[in-house]
């Protein structure tokens, strides 16, 4: 007897950024009032700043190449997709700040990359007691809750975690209480690709 199951829903891609590349990414992030990006974002976060796209792309090429291969298989593209970074920004998240459930408009895919996860936040998450996923988690939501259907994926991120997903995939970031600063980079992309004929 043979059997199979079918992939369903959006592609949620994950990989880990190498330490050397994390160091380079940190070097292109800065708190510059002239680069304030908050007017374009949904987050309740005080410090969010634009990143130079050329610098970001130069570091991220190998990871976007891996995503390209995954997308080719998931979406049955004839060839790899042409991926263009349209915006990138750094988030300096502090106690009490959060990102409400939202999507990214004007793009095909989005990503989030975690640069620094302080130990205090890890301990706060481990100590959490409750039915949710706890402080500092990122959650992705697809569709509505229903029996025998997986509609959400939740992660407590580690340093170097990189997630890439359709811009239309709802996601949110839980707040935390620790007196620390967690740094992440988000980006949006447009994708041009030709699907395989059915």
PLM feature spans:
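Histidine-centered metal-chelating micro-motifs
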Residues: 97-98, 168-172
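Catalytic core of non-heme Fe(II) oxygenases with the double-stranded beta-helix
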Residues: 87-164, 181, 191, 195
């Amino acid at each position: 007897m043979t059997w199979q199951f079918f992939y369903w829903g959006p592609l949620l891609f994950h990989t880990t950024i190498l330490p050397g590349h994390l160091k380079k990414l940190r070097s292109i992030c800065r708190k510059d009032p002239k680069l304030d990006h908050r007017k374009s974002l949904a987050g309740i976060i005080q410090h969010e700043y634009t990143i130079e796209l050329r610098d970001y792309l130069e570091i991220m090429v190998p990871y976007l190449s891996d995503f390209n291969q995954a997308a080719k298989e998931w979406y049955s593209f004839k060839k790899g997709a042409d991926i263009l970074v349209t915006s990138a920004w750094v988030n300096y998240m502090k106690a009490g700040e959060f990102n409400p459930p939202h999507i990214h408009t004007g793009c095909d895919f989005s990503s989030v990359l975690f640069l620094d996860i302080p130990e205090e936040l890890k301990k706060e998450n481990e100590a959490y007691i409750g039915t949710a996923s706890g402080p500092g988690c990122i959650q992705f939501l697809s569709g509505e809750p229903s029996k025998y259907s997986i509609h959400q994926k939740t992660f407590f991120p580690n340093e170097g975690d990189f997630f890439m997903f359709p811009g239309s995939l709802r996601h949110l970031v839980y707040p935390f209480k620790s007196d620390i600063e967690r740094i992440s980079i988000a980006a949006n992309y447009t994708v041009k690709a030709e699907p395989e004929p059915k």
